């Protein structure tokens, strides 16, 4: 695909021959609070998700023989363990669908960056194949399947900016301002498990109602520990916060700064050290994937 900024894609980009191209948008955790640890080891959270107008493309061509093929292969990851492949298989099994698919991922989002790349890929596979295979599952049924693949997958399946509580299963749709963000990835790989097992991690932030959380300054309880464990993140945030409110997304490694307009975000992004990667994108309260499906449905019923 020519662009990874979905709003600039033409409707003709969505369908090429027998293949459909579906967006897999990034996300940010605009805030993230850890309220406690359960007996099963999971952490209770309160977090606000917003999508970004930027991400991967998943191309899908339906097959009649039931086979699932996924390209390109990711080094050190078996295809059967890939979330996209697992999503397709789950949907096949759940619906007894006899169709298959050739899937190709055009990837730009960093793996393990805290921007939801793998979860977004899995959700797009579920939502898009449900549409192409005509398997007829509701959004809630797809979200339930998605939860088997990862805690963040249901948010992408629902396709609306949302406040999530508990271990991520309680979802309230939300409409935070659609600001512009400079998203930057330091050259470190962060283990979520390591962050959440760290003794110094704040685990007792008091639960608050959403209305109150939206009014106060947004922060991320993982950030203090990540800054301590990874000096590159500390250094990057110390630089970025000089220009705009900045923080970690998820458990990292990506950090982001928020701006009122694209030009301000791009100006600061251009000042970053060349050793860091990243992108500039606007926050979106409706996923580009769901906007595309609306267009396809309108065209089909038009």
Swiss-Prot record:
Keyword set, alphabetical order: ATP-binding, Isoprene biosynthesis, Kinase, Nucleotide-binding, Transferase
Record carries keyword tRNA processing: no
Recorded catalytic activity of this chain's protein: 4-CDP-2-C-methyl-D-erythritol + ATP = 4-CDP-2-C-methyl-D-erythritol 2-phosphate + ADP + H(+)
Binding site for ATP: 110-120
Domain of life from the UniProt record: Bacteria
Residues the record marks as active site: 27, 152
Gene3D superfamilies recorded: 3.30.230.10, GHMP kinase, C-terminal domain
InterPro entries for the chain: GHMP_kinase_C_dom, GHMP_kinase_C_sf, GHMP_kinase_N_dom, IspE, Ribosomal_Su5_D2-typ_SF, Ribsml_uS5_D2-typ_fold_subgr
Entry's EC annotation: 2.7.1.148
Keyword Kinase: yes
GO BP, sorted A to Z: isopentenyl diphosphate biosynthetic process, methylerythritol 4-phosphate pathway; terpenoid biosynthetic process
Disulphide-bonded residues: none
Any GO molecular function: ATP binding
HAMAP family: IspE
Family: Belongs to the GHMP kinase family. IspE subfamily.
Protein name: 4-diphosphocytidyl-2-C-methyl-D-erythritol kinase
Gene encoding the protein: ispE
């Amino acid at each position: 695909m020519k662009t990874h900024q979905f709003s600039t894609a033409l409707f003709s980009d969505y369908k090429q021959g027998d293949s459909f191209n579906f967006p897999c948008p990034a996300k940010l955790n605009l805030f993230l609070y850890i309220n406690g640890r359960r007996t099963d080891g999971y952490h209770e959270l309160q977090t606000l998700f917003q999508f970004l107008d930027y991400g991967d493309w998943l191309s899908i061509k339906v097959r009649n023989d039931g086979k699932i093929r996924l390209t390109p292969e990711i080094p050190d990851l078996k295809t059967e363990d890939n979330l996209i492949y697992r999503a397709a298989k789950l949907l096949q099994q759940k619906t007894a669908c006899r169709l298959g698919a050739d899937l190709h991922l055009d990837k730009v989002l960093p793996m393990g960056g805290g921007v939801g790349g793998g979860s977004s890929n899995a959700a797009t596979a579920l939502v898009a194949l449900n549409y192409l295979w005509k398997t007829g599952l509701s959004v809630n049924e797809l979200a339930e399947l998605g939860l088997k693949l990862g805690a963040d997958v249901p948010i992408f399946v629902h396709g609306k900016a949302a406040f999530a509580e508990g271990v991520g299963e309680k979802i309230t749709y939300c409409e935070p301002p659609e600001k512009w963000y400079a998203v930057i990835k330091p050259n470190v790989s962060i283990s979520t498990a390591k962050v959440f097992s760290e003794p110094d991690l704040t685990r007792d932030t008091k639960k608050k109602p959403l209305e109150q959380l939206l009014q106060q300054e947004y922060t991320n309880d993982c950030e203090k520990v990540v800054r301590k464990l990874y000096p590159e993140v500390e250094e990057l945030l110390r630089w970025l916060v000089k220009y705009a409110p900045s923080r970690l997304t998820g458990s990292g490694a990506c950090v982001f700064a928020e701006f009122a307009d694209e030009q301000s975000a791009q100006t600061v992004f251009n000042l970053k050290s060349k050793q860091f990667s990243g992108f500039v994108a606007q926050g979106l309260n409706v996923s580009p994937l769901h906007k595309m499906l609306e267009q396809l449905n309108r065209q089909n019923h038009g």
